[in-house]
Design a protein with these regions (language model features):
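Active-site gating/metal-coordination segments in enzymes
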Residues: 36-154
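Catalytic metal-binding/acid-base residues of hydrolase active sites
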Residues: 97, 127-128, 159, 178, ...
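Histidine/acidic-residue-rich catalytic or RNA/ligand-binding cores of hydrolases
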Residues: 132-138, 178-193, 220-226, 242-253
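Divalent metal-coordination and catalytic microenvironments
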Residues: 30, 38, 58, 68, ...
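Aromatic-lined glycan-binding groove of carbohydrate-active enzymes
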Residues: 162, 166-203
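Active-site gating loops and adjacent loop-to-helix segments of metal-dependent hydrolytic enzymes
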Residues: 1-20, 130-151, 188-207
Length: 285
């Protein structure tokens, strides 16, 4: 029996496009893709808006094949506490730069404290327009370069501001393989050699979770080697054009040990989002 496949990039929103709002169609397409369980989350540009309505609608969709992430205003940590207390949602999606605030900003201190205390998974996704450079409007660079770069800058800000040191038990998932953050680990470590406090950057980076939406087998292999198989989650970016229709294929192309592959294609997501799931539930029926 193969490992259960769980993809977390199933963006769900009440929009005009059927791909965004028709759960039956979403599950049909995931059947064709070989995905057993989907994780639905808000469209990033709606994060923090109509919080209660979105969270209630998403929670109502939760079931055997559907796990959900909600949304909150990160400057109102009481929203996260209330959402997690409800119990139907195990985490939230936030923009990489919510309301123009980078993730290490003191204004978000309460949010990170609440996220650690409640055990919430915090999925960080770029806003798709994080940089106003005119060149980003050319050649689809706002997406191919701008999106991962936005995540990179804000995650580096989170690390450099000491948030990961203050809250070592945070569960933070970075979209698109963490952007280019892993490739910058040497530069970030060098900066800590010349400036206090001299933290272990490599160890801090390995506290992040990253997804598999990198579109390159060798890039994904590097992520698994650096972060470890227990920190990489399967993603699809469904139904967007830069997503992948068969998300598990790139993982299986790595020819990893079966236990490591099982973690990436489903086990890690279930551990974070469905902690009551028994081990045998993590295998395909």
């Amino acid at each position: 029996m193969g490992a259960q496949v769980v993809t977390h990039h199933g963006h769900e929103t009440r929009a005009a496009l059927r791909e965004f709002q028709d759960l039956h169609r979403i599950l049909e397409e995931q059947d064709r893709a070989g995905v057993d369980v989907v994780v639905l989350c808000p469209w990033v540009n709606l994060c923090g808006i109509e919080v209660e309505r979105q969270n209630e609608a998403l929670a109502d969709l939760a079931g055997e094949r559907v796990l959900v992430l909600g949304t909150v205003d990160p400057e109102r940590p009481e929203q996260l506490v209330a959402l997690m207390r409800d119990g139907r949602v195990r985490g939230v999606e936030i923009p990489a730069v919510p309301n123009g605030v980078y993730l290490g900003d003191p204004r978000l201190a309460g949010f990170w404290a609440a996220a650690e205390e409640t055990g919430a998974l915090v999925f960080v996704h770029p806003s798709s327009r994080g940089f106003t450079l005119p060149v980003m409007d050319e050649h689809y660079l706002w997406n191919t370069v701008g999106n991962p770069l936005e995540t990179t800058v804000s995650a580096a800000h989170l690390l450099s501001a000491g948030v990961l040191d203050a809250h070592p038990h945070l569960n933070v998932l970075l979209a698109h393989g963490g952007g280019v953050l892993p490739a910058l680990r040497g530069r970030l470590a060098r900066e800590q050699e010349i400036h206090p406090p001299g933290r272990d950057v490599h160890a801090a980076l390995k506290r992040f979770f990253v997804d598999s939406v990198v579109h390159d087998v060798e890039v994904l292999r590097g992520l698994v080697e650096f972060f470890g198989a227990d920190r990489v989650l399967l993603g699809s970016d469904y139904p967007f054009d830069m997503g992948t229709e068969h998300p598990a294929e790139i993982v299986r192309a790595l020819s990893l040990p079966p236990d490591d592959e099982a973690l990436i294609v489903g086990g890690n997501a279930l551990r974070l989002l469905d902690p009551t799931s028994p081990a045998d539930h993590r295998q395909r029926r």
